[in-house]
From Swiss-Prot:
SMART domains: HDc
Segments for region (Uridylyl-removing): 319-675
Alphabetical keyword list: Hydrolase, Magnesium, Multifunctional enzyme, Nucleotidyltransferase, Repeat, Transferase
Reaction catalysis annotation: [protein-PII]-L-tyrosine + UTP = [protein-PII]-uridylyl-L-tyrosine + diphosphate; [protein-PII]-uridylyl-L-tyrosine + H2O = [protein-PII]-L-tyrosine + UMP + H(+)
Domain characteristics, as noted in the entry: Has four distinct domains: an N-terminal nucleotidyltransferase (NT) domain responsible for UTase activity, a central HD domain that encodes UR activity, and two C-terminal ACT domains that seem to have a role in glutamine sensing.
Catalytic activity, EC: 2.7.7.59, 3.1.4.-
Protein's organism: Bordetella bronchiseptica (strain ATCC BAA-588 / NCTC 13252 / RB50)
Protein name according to UniProt: Bifunctional uridylyltransferase/uridylyl-removing enzyme
Domain HD, chain residue ranges per copy: 437-559
Keyword Repeat: yes
Amino acid sequence: MPHVDLNPLKQRMQAARAAAVAQFRQHPRPDMLLTELRRIVDQALRELVKLCPLPAGATLAAVGGYGRGELYPHSDVDLLILLPQPPSAADARAVEALVAALWDLGLEPGHSVRTLEDCEREARGDITVETALLESRWLAGSRTLMKRLDSAMQARLDAAVFFQAKRVEMQQRHARYQDTPYALEPNCKESPGGLRDLQVILWMARAAGFGHSWREVAQAGLLTSSEARDLRRAEQAFKRLRIELHLLTGRREDRVLFDLQPGLAAVYGIASTATRRASELLMQRYYWAARLVTQLNVILVQNIEERLFPRPDSDARLIDDDFRNLRERLDIVREDGFERNPTLLLRAFLVMQQHPELIGMSARTLRAIWHSRHRIDAQFRRNPVNRKLFLQILQQPRGIVHELRRMTMLNILPRYLPVFRRIVGQMQHDLFHVYTVDQHTLAVVRNLRRFTMPEHAQEYPLASQLIAGLDRHWLLYVAALFHDIAKGRGGDHSELGAREVRRFAQDHGLDPADAELVEFLVRHHLLMSAVAQKRDLSDPQVVRDFAAQVGDERRLAALYLLTVADIRGTSPRVWNAWKGKLLEDLFRLTLAALGGAHADAHTVLTERKDEAARLTRLAGLRDDAREAFWNQLDIAYFLRHDASEIAWHTRHLYYQVAPDEPVVRVRPTEHGEGLQVMVYTRDAPDLFVTTCGYFDAKSLSVQDARVHTTRHGWALDSFIVLAPEGFADLRAQATLVEHELAERLRDPHAARHAHAPRRLPHSHARRSRVFPVMPQAELSPDERSQSWRLSVTATDRPGLLYALARVFAEHGVDLIMAKIMTLGERVEDVFIVSGSALERPRSQMQFERAILDALAGDEPRQQAA
């Protein structure tokens, strides 16, 4: 085939597309741009087939979205080359030349070459192919063959079968996206509540003969005019978002990625406020639109199902005067029931809880609730009957989380609790929350509910035991609903939330003790986590101070339960068994303190040594051998380690008090997710740096570090480290660490050059780059000792602890203890340190600057001594 110069056609097409985009920038009307881009490509293709002819009798058809008449700036151009018979060699060459020309033209064709029989066979086996062919549109070639395809597709279309297949396909797609529209980086095309859901409804409606557009579907009685208007608005919003994503990235990109969210917000003219990022405001708009689509999708799919598979209403069984069971769905008896008696807007959810045979609500009921939600106003909220109903929903033995989720989706909970409305769809770009505030809140309620279920007792033994003994544990659900309700307002969200829940408690008639409990829980919902993860629990004063703040055992149990549920509802990556152990340790120590066991340091020391001695005797150690080793240890060591750790150290070190080689011993932790590492060697300035460098290179995440120097100058350091995710054989890992770390300590200088920090997963690195945490460092003297407390906050990154350890070594600062608190991609660490450099203002300032540089990822500044 002779060479065809496509440059003139390509240049005309590119100029026309650029003009269309420029027009869109002046007047951002999505449909106008999509139609114009489609028209430009239609015209280019018709010119192209004159230059590169189709095989004789063949048809060129647009399919899929392009066939529907929409073309996004960087979408594939979906084409069908329809042949009247299987291709000859000449036909194959003609098709090959045409496809090559499509690429040369700068289009990205998604093409298929089929006969009519091929199309029918493929459509029978794949609902996606059938849907694409149903939207086929003639571009060039044989119109007769195109009509035969249209006739064949319509003839084989079975509305009922098509509906069921599309519903299954939609359910599978939703499952791939975790069944939530609230993803951190949603796909505006494929995620639940996105463009694809809108297209599915129209495909179903079209197949059933209810129309091709929202107006026609409304005329068929499946939609009200206001619903059609809402869906049309949402569709336009998502179309524009998808267009902006393509234009912003210069590629086919349908995901609202972290990196793109600030740029998108700027395109939309959304500015940051004093309390919220522009990207958070953008995403809240997205989630509100996706929630609307999700809800109307449920109503419409049920409506179409009821039309396609009609069953007589005689199947219905009355539940009471207002509701009936219609095919295992809750159905309102009177269409105007909610308008006549708005109290039913809450009672509907209570009835759902009380009737486990119900699998959902009928489309009629969902629609009636949706359209009556405006009846929940100030007068409704003041009504004692409604207040009692709301508390009853929280007090039911089943269905609490399901109904709270349904109430949120139908906009009933945000209407009843206006303060809750502010947090619906509110994303927190803080590097550790992976849910919107409302979804996190409901996840906390779900976790609290799980504590009450026997099937989860093995997973949460202490929590299950405590909640079973907690009087009126439904108060925890109230605290959960309000614990983050003031997020995004500025100020202390715990304090603001406490005021909101106090008002709720007064309005809903909670007795004074219960009102005081929920207010305490909301005000102090972060307290237990902070103390457990940032303070030294071996210090009796820390426990006494915490016990004084908590006050009594009921508060302690409730705070423990809320804390565990809260952390576990933040992100799958934030919770680990080590945090669980710290919280449980703090709970038990505080319980003892509240019970009158106000032990001073001397009593704690005596009891701990007695228990450790008992454990060493059980291991066969003689008292004199043990005491020879213990004589090298001071009081601080015994106060900082529990009896089990002391006994473990003693068993391995009593016979080698001054060894020539480093001693490294490792064992799996009690909770089975990490390793406990003991390092015993002659003390050296770079010891902590070397050890941290090894852990970092092996992707072992340090959770806790305790550094001790014996009376005769040996370092006895203890670490809790977590193994990489998915590492199952902890005993094999323990053996490997014992060998490798001992080797590293024998020759630390050679190892320094071999250190290669671990890498964060790509998505985490992107998120932390776009939404970094401002590095903070606060150095303050410890009021009860000669040491200092260094608190740091920063974005997590490979080698961070190693970088800090190097700063300690370079400034002559000794580490006594480290408490590492990792919250997703954010770290909040506390170090107890000492050193003469901290006593002089100038060198202290240089140390703090170097710490900030390390937190920010910069090379330490060279300071004059």
